[in-house]
A protein has these predicted regions:
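Short alpha-helical elements
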Residues: 1-255
């Protein structure tokens, strides 16, 4: 599947203007990136119809370092959030296996969000989602990190809610600190208490069923091979793919 010229027009203004005699258009590069994301192939394995693989890889790397893909995600996200009229958001995480090619980042790049758990090397994606197609914000952590602290960082990055919004979370986030932060920010936490709670609380079980929306979004993202497994040594490149895949999936829903 490819991004059509009509869909590309929605994100074209986010990309650097091409000048001079350019062999590969930005649309060609974007579709090559989508091919790699969907099939999980090595950059060298790109079909010849996309052009020189190294040019494509270099351009994506440049866009990632310059924050172009983040800007693209934020622009499209604004359109999606206006369309869905947020009343409920869900906070959750999912574990990503790290391929051997994704380990061993040079130390000069600093620590990466890769950690070891019982299943081997893993990365965790933490996400706040408005529905099964719309991510609000996301981040990475090493696989062994606990969900609650990362969830609180995401909530703090959102800032105060403009109006009361239900925040659906599973038991990993039922701690007092997380629930209090949600209340302080203007959210209405909907989270079941752990069974060992001395004073358990009631929660909206019907509303809680909508938490499956963030799980469905994770399932959509994992349909892309480059998201399902982490091949990137650097967080920046993996986050770049994640932003780009959310954009590509969002374009299909909008156009």
């Amino acid at each position: 599947m490819e991004i059509t010229p009509e869909q590309f027009k929605r994100i074209e203004h986010c990309l650097p203007v091409q000048r001079g005699n350019v062999r590969l258009s930005n649309l060609q590069v974007v579709n090559a990136m989508l091919y790699v994301a969907e099939h999980g192939c090595k950059w060298r394995g790109l079909p010849n119809r996309f052009g020189n693989w190294h040019t494509i890889y270099t351009r994506m790397r440049r866009w990632t370092k310059a924050g172009v893909l983040d800007k693209m995600f934020e622009e499209l996200q604004r359109e999606q959030l206006v369309r869905v009229k947020i009343e409920v958001v869900s906070l959750d995480s999912t574990s990503i296996k790290v391929h051997p090619d994704g380990t061993g980042a040079p130390k000069k790049n600093g620590p990466q969000a890769i950690g070891k758990s019982r299943g081997g090397w893993n990365t965790e994606i933490h996400m706040v989602a408005a529905d099964a197609r719309t991510a609000v914000t996301f981040c990475l952590s090493p696989g062994q990190a606990h969900d609650a602290p990362e969830g609180r960082r995401l909530l703090q990055s959102l800032g105060p809610a403009s109006r009361p919004i239900h925040l659906l979370m599973d038991r990993a986030y039922e701690g007092n600190e997380t629930r209090q932060l949600a209340l302080d920010l203007g959210f209405i936490p909907v989270v079941p208490p752990v069974r060992t709670r001395i004073e358990p609380w009631e929660y909206d079980r019907v509303m809680y069923k909508r938490r499956n929306e963030v799980e469905r979004l994770f399932r959509r993202l994992k349909g892309y091979r480059r998201i399902f497994s982490r091949f990137e040594k650097l967080d920046a490149m993996y986050l770049g793919f994640l932003s780009f895949v959310l954009v590509a999936d969002g374009l299909r829903g909008l156009c």
